[in-house]
Amino acid sequence: LDVVMGLENRIVYDIVDVVENNCRLEQAMIRDKRYDGLYLLPAAQTRDKTSVTPFQMKELVGDLKEEMEMDYVIVDSPAGIEQGFKNAIAGADRAIIVTTPEISAVRDADRIIGLLEAEGLRDPEVIINRIRADMVDRGDMMGIEDMIEILAIDLIGIVPEDEGIVVSTNKGEPIALNDKAKAGEAYRNIARRIMGEDLPMMKLEKDNFITRFKKLVGLS
């Protein structure tokens, strides 16, 4: 996330420094250059990520909500079900699973749903990432309806495959700030749904020659 947000060069302390009392919580938090109310608390940069326990993570999330008065605390979980996953869900009261339209990814997501429910996180939601309408139409990619039928949880957003994400990541400029990018629109819609708005799902655009040309010249 530090790279995506363009904050990687401003990291001095990280989450391990906080739990080991090497710095105060507010010292480790990096304020975004564009939004005053947006902060990043970096993960461990060099040390073992198991240095943080689920108990410490739960306390940390509580401090962010109460002492720092954060409206939302979003914990980005690493892939898999190892210690990083256990830490991520320790202080969570809501879970959003991000998956892709691949059979193996959907199986993993289904397994994660079971683990979340076993930990008391009921009613998780799902984001379907990197979906392409043309491949779905050809039968080369799982469709949204098929995935939701398998997972049996609510859909909170779909994100189309977008080459602009690579460009925005390399520039350290979140694509959500790009008004012309479909993926940016998708992310903004997801954020609004998280905040309680009822929005229809965006219609997927088939990636044909015309749409690729528009993206190339900056018309879409």
Residue ranges of predicted features:
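Generic secondary-structure signature for well-ordered alpha-helical cores
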Residues: 34, 118, 152-153, 161, ...
